[in-house]
Amino acid sequence: GVTEQDTKVAGLAHEAGKACIIVVNKWDAIEKDGKTMQRMEEDVRRDLSYMTYAPVLFISALTGQRVDRLFDLIDNVVNQAAMRIPTGVLNQVLADAQARVQPPTDKGRRLKIYYMTQIGVKPPHFVIFCNDARLFHFSYQRYLENQIRGTFGLTGTPVRITIRQKGDKEEL
């Protein structure tokens, strides 16, 4: 299972915005039935619940089982973390997402999202400009992150989203 040290290292990687793959080694040494892999992945996902974006791969370094897939996955994750998405394409995804689920309201005030742009890579970092950042609920931010992930993949990399009120002069 996931050790305390695994959890600490994973937490440091997550906080630092590093792309990650969760690799479970010594797969050859585990007694398996038809549900072993599924149960193990559920356990790993529960213990590292903040890393939902990280793929889980079961390998055996001793026998070489799935090691070739690991290198393909590393290439894929590195490319995803460095991906740049044009502002126009991002804003189409944003418009589609808002059409499916309207932005939240609070005491009659509706959140208006003006646009989104990417300001960094490794990890992908986006900034969303809106009328009132206080109206931007974390669940709607997570919804938009999931829409971006669903559209562009972004496997194995955290995604950063910063909310800015129009007229804010803060550093990005």
Predicted regions and their residues:
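C-terminal-of-GTPase-core extension/linker across diverse P-loop GTPases
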Residues: 2-172
